[in-house]
Amino acid sequence: VATLAGMYAYNQFVASTSTKKNMLPTKNGSYYSWKQGNVFYTKTGTGDPVLLIHDTNSASSSVEWSKISKRLQKKHTVYTMDLLGCGLSDKPGLSYTNYMYVQLITAFIKDIIKSKTSVVASNLSSSFVIMANQLDASIIDKMIFINPVSFHSMDAMPDQQSKLKQTIINLPLVGTFIYNLLMNPKRIDRQFRFIYYCRPQLISSKTKDAYYEAAHMDNLSLIHISEPT
């Protein structure tokens, strides 16, 4: 009982402190009411449309594109979106599959952008864009991928160990506790230093704070899509 009480107290502490800095920007933001939930997005600039889609790491959000979007908006209408389950978007309790994101991207372009658009995506999200283009080539103009996943890795099916991890992490108390231990500030700092950046001096504390906040919005995550590294 004492152990469970300790887990509960720790979870409450993380929930109350992780988002108090309000680091996720809402300027120029709106919500797209999609069939599975509300999706936060921003629209800036004028010109040919460009959609920026972030990675699916548990701490990812459209903050990933904050510097790039400022440059692109000088010549383009730039859209960024927080994928469902990420950032300021809704985090419904459902299975987050690749095909669900393909549907979301397709619907967003048709309903919000309403014209053929170029898409820039990173890591696993690149696969969503490729599939969306295969299903409907009329919605995407050009595709640019940053550090995309290999096609061989996309062939892998979830094994029993992966399913067990997902079952544990989805437990209301214990799963949340484990997730909070995994997605702590020190771990996020290591991700930036050894995965995201080759020049640590370029890492800003504001960016790390934004990722930490995104990782703990509503205590839900995409850990069943992309486990923390």
Residue locations for each model-derived region?
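Residue-level detector of conserved catalytic or cofactor/ligand-binding positions
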Residues: 223-229
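Conserved catalytic-core motifs of eukaryotic protein kinase domains, centered on the activation segment
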Residues: 62-64, 89-94, 155-156
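Conserved hydrolase catalytic core segment
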Residues: 115-158
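Alpha/beta-hydrolase fold catalytic core
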Residues: 1-50, 74-76, 114
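Helix-rich cap/lid subdomain of alpha/beta-hydrolase
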Residues: 154-209
